[in-house]
Swiss-Prot record:
Name by which UniProt lists this protein: Integrin alpha-M
Gene3D superfamilies (alphabetical): Bicelle-embedded integrin alpha(iib) transmembrane segment, Integrin alpha, N-terminal, Integrin domains. Chain A, domain 2, ntegrin, alpha v. Chain A, domain 3, ntegrin, alpha v. Chain A, domain 4, von Willebrand factor, type A domain
Gene name of the encoded protein: Itgam
Source organism (scientific name): Mus musculus (Mouse)
GO biological process per UniProt: activated T cell proliferation; amyloid-beta clearance; cell adhesion; cell-cell adhesion; cellular extravasation; complement receptor mediated signaling pathway; complement-mediated synapse pruning; forebrain development
Phylogenetic placement of the source organism: Eukaryota, Metazoa, Chordata, Craniata, Vertebrata
Motif (GFFKR motif): 1132-1136
Glycosylation sites: 58, 86, 391, 696, 734, 772, 801, 881, 907, 941, 980, 994, 1022, 1045, 1051, 1076
């Protein structure tokens, strides 16, 4: 992306469309929290709160009035009462127009009640004159809460106390009781010694709350000190509802004694745990020196509640009791039970009244989030004396910590007022409740719950009157902490329910991606109609975006009950100042502060108020009229492409700028600079027309417009012959508009409406060649042929060619299309068209679309061709060939059916000529092989004297290599007889598999009777010379890729053998596969594969007698042996020479004598 593009994108992000973000008026005060809340007061003023500003000791919060006319802010004087401690004035603000009122609240007033600090609120209602003292609501802070307490005095009446001290003890008790005179405290008293006497119960005190009338008549009992038993009796009897004890009151026991217990059968370990379980808080007062001993002191610690140091008082004598009465009173007052039973420990002590504020027709409505354990609610002040508390506890008991009243809004429908309160912490998901008045009582009418834990659904509310008729149409509910991975916060758009219908939110609004902590929806306001569409627009703040720099989103009204789903613009705080923080934390709109009649927006940021002015919105209207209305045929029709530059006509272009918004601006002052571009046929690569002025198909001009119309006339030229004379020439106008600053209104600049039409088009059509009536009536006809093919063999050649011929014997045909419907086993591959005799080029035939329907058995496909679009001329004929691929697995039945339909945009009625149906017989290619197996007996021999027969077998293998299963018949031919002599005796047909087959046999005579001559010529014994058995076996299904073997077996005798010059004969059997040739076909050259034969060579031989040969051979061998022996003897072979050799050697070897 270029630097320029990045800059344009950045400007688009921050530009507020018709909110002037370039010249905002900024107010800044050095007051802590300034800008946290803002409201438009009316006139030219905005009230800005600074709730954290410390004006004096224990006084926080201030109000400022910022005026557009003076560009300055000044504090609003307010005399705050001294009890308004740290009230955070201005934390909530509200205004009303009729009458003009300002309601400012400080909901953090700190009120100290004894040892506790409570948080309440004070609000001030100003009239039109902010200098006059406002009314205060409530008129005074509530009194400190009084704790219900049931107090029992257990006094020691033993004999160790003299009468004077006993009277002092009675005076002490009376004085302490009188100090609780205006509290919610009841008293009871028991005296103990050896016996126990209840002098008055809680019921007695309730009937007569005079302490002295109960205490004065008491007489001392005297006796021993049974303190433990007295404590048990108090716990079990006096703290009982029969004696007036209250279930939720604090139970307090005050024990006054002068010594250790004595004579008591009970130990403290027997009674103190019971008192603890009953929740009795025990104070013990030890009187006298007896408790100076460690053991006695430990007894006091045992009696008292823990820690003992907080609950034990020790004085030296009864005279000193008056020194501890204030201490005892303060400790009892400090007892604040947290929560007992089902009763909340807090009612309105922590109310924070005024946390939200609205002005109703009855009076101020102040949200009270802390009431009743932060269940919340609201106070409605109809007069100074009449206050109504509104909450939902009667309907929904599970409202603890819900913060009802965190936000508030007022609804007006048919002059009936309703109230809406938000409870963002209800069950951690949030709740918004609508209240309606029923005979003076505000009751919940309907409600909406949030969806995400922690989203703070209901933290902000805004009622919207979409059409400014005085009736509320919808409520905006903010959930600023709604979390998604890439953005934070959302706003629900909730139209008001009709009748008893359920209240539902129909849409959700979000900020931009990339800001998970953006808090979108933290502030909501009505803008009014800022874009002039007569629907109310709204602004939504997201102060946490861009690391807390903040942003404001503008959403336009979409209808009377909805807003646009996406924002029209986003204004970021960083655009105004890099250091600006929390821009959009508060918003106020809907009023004209700049006296120009346009609604303005006040935006609060940390330490700043920014006033964004609305800008007037303009729209541009354009008209373009051609003269003549159509391009004449004489201009564009030609047979050859020749440059002509003919005058096509003129176009009159008129522009008018109108103001879309209602304002106080003078129409004569509004001007804008308009740059507009004209383009002829802007999307075509080859232009069909151009402007005579520019010699191009484009033209640009810039003019300054007021709120008036300007026109100009332009001449159009056609440079060439037009191929496409059906589509009109398109003239497109697009423009930019920049408003000129209005000097008299602070350089306010008009802007073009965001949804304005940015380009305009006009069409310059061509005159049609349709006769005088201007209605083209074509006369189309269509035929098809299979291009000489008489039968389609499926599984053979993979393509199928067809010829389509189309004629138009009428006028020009527009948008002519041919659609061919064909079975799903065909697939369109290509086409080729014949030549157009006019242009000497091929006709333009182009496939437009293909579709298929897979419903039912007859699934069809279709292909549509555009024929010479856009015009198929009159008296023309085109032929184009179409090639389909044929699926080898397809099944068409016994014929292929193709249907063609021709149609056009002329909308002529269909005739029989516009349809054609082509039928073509179909056969299915098969591929089967039968072969002679090697296991067949190929050779047999015999002697003339041999009379026994030999076994012979011929074996064949059958294989279906094709893609289809089919029924077949297997036929075998076996020679069984020649010259009335049996050759193959009892032939058998044996299948290798258990096939379902039916075989039948018949005997066939040879065609040749002169079998000897035949065998002499050819030594082959087959069915041409011998009688044969024809065995036919019918198989119902020969499955794809199936293989089976068949063996022909029998006995072969040799009586039939006929000698020939060849010395042998060939015995031949044969087989053949038969099938239905009307449905199936063999591919060319495969006819021999379905036939086979097996030959066995049969040869005779002679058997010779071996005895003469053996005898002759033996005698001859003996004679030959005798002759050889005689010859050797004659030669001396058998004479011994050893003796002669010994004789010759004797004289030489004799030893000497």
């Amino acid at each position: 992306m270029t630097l320029k593009a990045l800059l344009v994108t950045a400007l688009a992000l921050c530009h507020g469309f018709n909110l002037d973000t370039e010249h905002p008026m900024t107010f800044q005060e050095n007051a802590k929290g300034f800008g946290q809340n803002v409201v438009q007061l009316g006139g030219t003023s905005v009230v800005v709160a600074a709730p954290q500003e410390a004006k004096a000791v224990n006084q926080t919060g201030a109000l400022y009035q910022c005026d557009y006319s003076t560009s300055r802010c000044h504090p609003i004087p307010l005399q705050v009462p001294p009890e308004a401690v740290n009230m955070s004035l201005g934390l909530s603000l509200a205004v009303s127009t009729v009458p003009q009122q300002l309601l400012a609240c400080g909901p953090t007033v700190h009120q100290n009640c004894k040892e506790n600090t409570y948080v309440n609120g004070l609000c001030y209602l100003f009239g039109s004159n902010l200098l006059r003292p406002p009314q205060q609501f409530p008129e005074a802070l509530r009194e400190c809460p009084q704790q219900e307490s049931d107090i029992v005095f257990l006094i020691d009446g033993s004999g160790s106390i003299n009468n004077i001290d006993f009277q002092k003890m009675k005076e002490f008790v009376s004085t302490v009781m009188e100090q609780f005179k205006k509290s919610k405290t009841l008293f009871s008293l028991m005296q103990y010694s050896d016996e126990f006497r209840i002098h008055f119960t809680f019921n007695d005190f309730k009937r007569n709350p005079s302490p002295r009338s109960h205490v004065s008549p008491i007489k001392q009992l005297n006796g021993r000190t049974k303190t433990a038993s007295g404590i048990r009796k108090v716990v079990r009897e006096l703290f009982h509802k029969t004696n007036g004890a209250r279930e939720n009151a604090a139970k307090i026991l005050v024990v006054i004694t002068d010594g250790e217990k004595f004579g008591d059968p009970l130990d403290y370990k027997d009674v103190i745990p019971e008192a603890d379980r009953a929740g009795v808080i025990r104070y013990v007062i030890g009187v006298g020196n007896a408790f100076n001993k460690p053991q006695s002191r430990r007894e006091l610690d045992t009696i008292a509640s823990k820690p003992a140091g907080e609950h034990v008082f020790q004085v030296d004598n009864f005279e000193a009791l008056n020194t501890i009465q204030n201490q005892l009173q303060e400790k009892i007052f400090a007892i604040e039970g947290t929560q007992t039973g089902s009763t909340s420990s807090f009612e309105h002590e922590m109310s924070q009244e005024g946390f939200s504020a609205s002005i109703t027709s009855n009076g101020p409505l102040l949200g009270s989030v802390g009431s009743f354990d932060w269940a919340g609610g609201a106070f409605l002040y109809t007069s100074k004396d009449k206050v109504t508390f509104i909450n939902t506890t009667r309907v929904d008991s599970d409202m603890n910590d819900a913060y009802l009243g965190y936000a508030s809004a007022v609804i007006l429908r048919n002059r009936v007022q309703s109230l809406v309160l938000g409870a963002p912490r209800y069950q951690h998901i949030g709740l918004v409740v609508m209240f309606r008045e029923n005979f003076g009582t505000w009751e919940p009418h309907t409600s909406i719950k949030g969806s995400q834990i922690g989203s703070y659904f209901g933290a902000s509310l805004c009622s919207v009157d979409m059409d400014a008729d005085g009736n509320t149409n919808l409520i905006l509910i903010g959930a600023p902490h709604y979390y998604e991975k890439t953005r934070g916060g959302q706003v629900s758009v909730c139209p008001l329910p009709r009748g008893r219908a359920r209240w539902q939110c129909e849409a959700l609004l979000h900020g931009d991606q990339g800001h998970p902590w953006g808090r979108f929806g933290a502030a909501l306001t009505v803008l009014g109609d800022v874009n002039g569409d007569k629907l109310t627009d709204v602004a939504i703040g997201a102060p946490g975006e861009q690391e807390n720099q903040g942003a404001v989103y503008i959403f336009y009204g979409a209808s009377i009950a909805s807003l646009s789903a996406s924002h029209s613009h986003r204004i970021i705080g960083a655009h105004f100042s890099p250091g600006l923080q929390y821009f959009g934390q508060s918003l106020s709109g809907g009023k004209d502060l700049t006296m120009d009649g346009l609604m303005d927006l006040a935006v609060g940021a940390q330490g700043h108020l920014l006033l964004l002015r609305a800008q007037p919105v303009l729209r541009l209207e354009a008209t373009m009229e051609f003269s003549p209305k159509k391009v004449a045929r004489s201009v564009f029709a030609c047979q050859e492409q020749v440059l002509k530059n003919k005058d096509a006509g003129e176009v009159r272009v008129c522009l008018r700028v109108r103001k879309n918004t209602k304002d106080r601006l003078r129409e004569g002052d509004i001007q804008s600079t308009v740059t507009y571009d004209l383009a002829l046929d802007p999307v075509r690569s080859r232009i069909r027309a151009f402007f005579d002025e520019t010699k191009n198909n484009t033209r640009r001009r810039t003019q300054v417009f007021g709120l008036m119309q300007k026109c100009e006339t332009l001449k159009l030229i056609l440079p060439d012959c037009v191929d496409d004379s059906v589509s009109p020439i398109i003239l497109r106008l697009n423009y930019t508009l920049v408003g000129e600053p209005l000097r008299s209104f602070g350089n306010l600049r008009p802007v073009l409406a965001m949804d304005a039409q940015r380009f305009f088009t006009a069409m310059f059509p061509f005159e049609k060649n349709c006769g005088n009536d201007s209605i083209c009536q074509d006369d189309l006809s269509i035929t098809m042929s299979a291009m000489g093919l008489d039968t389609l063999v499926v599984g053979g050649p993979q393509d199928f060619n067809m010829s389509v011929t189309l004629r138009n014997d009428g006028e020009d045909s527009y948008g002519t299309q041919v659609t061919v419907y064909y079975p799903s086993g065909l697939s369109y591959r290509k086409d080729s068209a014949s030549q157009n005799p006019l242009t000497k080029k091929p006709w333009f035939v182009k496939p437009a679309e293909s579709s298929s329907s897979s419903e039912g058995h007859g699934a069809l496909k279709s292909t549509t061709w555009n024929i010479n679009h856009p015009i198929f001329p009159a008296n023309s004929e085109v032929t184009f060939n179409v090639t389909f691929d044929v699926d080898s697995h397809a099944s068409f039945g016994n014929k292929l059916l193709l249907k063609a339909i021709v149609a056009s945009e002329n909308n002529m009625s269909r005739t029989h000529k516009t349809k054609f149906q082509l039928e073509l017989p179909v056969k299915y290619a098969i591929y089967m092989i039968v072969t002679s197996d090697e296991s067949s007996i190929r050779y047999l021999n015999f002697t003339a004297s041999e009379m026994t027969s030999k076994v012979i077998q011929h074996q064949y293998q059958f294989n279906n290599l094709g893609q289809r299963s089919l029924p077949v018949s297997v036929v075998f031919w076996i020679p069984v007889q020649i010259n009335n002599v049996t050759v193959w005796d009892h032939p058998q047909v044996i299948f290798s598999q258990n096939l379902s087959s039916a075989c039948h046999t018949e005997q066939k005579s040879p065609p040749h009777s002169n079998f000897r001559d035949q065998l002499e010529r050819t030594p082959v014994l087959n069915c041409s010379v011998a009688v044969c058995k024809r065995i036919q076996c019918d198989l119902p299904s020969f499955n794809t890729q199936e293989i089976f073997n068949v063996t022909l077996k029998g006995n072969l005798s040799f009586d039939w053998y006929i000698k020939t010059s060849h010395g042998h004969l060939l015995l031949v059997s044969s087989t053949e596969i038969l099938f239905n040739d009307s449905a199936f076909a063999l591919l060319p050259g495969q006819e021999s594969y379905v036939r086979s034969k097996t030959e066995t060579k049969v040869e005779p031989y002679e058997v010779h007698n071996p005895v003469p040969l053996i005898v002759g051979s033996s005698i001859g061998g003996l004679v030959l042996l005798a002759l050889i022996t005689a010859g050797l003897y004659k030669l001396g072979f058998f004479k011994r020479q050893y003796k002669d050799m010994m004789n010759e050697a004797a004289p030489q070897d004799a030893p000497p004598q």
